[in-house]
Design a protein with these regions (language model features):
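Short, Lys/Arg-enriched N-terminal segments with co-localized hydrophobic residues
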Residues: 1-6
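A basic, amphipathic helix-loop patch mediating RNA/tRNA/ribosome contacts
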Residues: 7-49
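Glycine-rich, charged/polar anion/phosphate-binding loops
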Residues: 52
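C-terminal structural segments of small proteins and small subunits
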Residues: 59-86
């Protein structure tokens, strides 16, 4: 096998457009507003497919499953990098 693709959490959040700016993603990680698989995750966490990311946006929490990891995603493709779990 060629090994799993991984990507830093802050970068994944930006490329997938879950969070528009990487600095915001970093701050969210630092403030422990982001968990991966139920555990608080730092910006340097290596995201892999199948991970469940939860992001707390004020009153709302968004929970997504990582479907794919791509270095660069066009806006149309970005949504395909994850699926929201309701």
């Amino acid at each position: 096998g060629q090994g799993e693709r991984k990507m830093r959490l802050d970068k994944y959040l930006k490329v997938s457009r879950l969070i528009k700016r990487r600095t915001v993603a970093n701050d969210a990680c630092d403030a422990a507003r982001i968990t991966v698989n139920g555990k608080s995750a730092k910006a340097s966490y290596q995201v892999k497919t199948g991970d469940i990311i939860e992001i707390a946006f004020g009153q709302r929490t968004m929970k997504v499953e990582v479907l794919e990891i791509a270095e660069h995603a066009l806006k149309a493709d970005a949504a395909g990098m994850y699926r929201e779990i309701l």
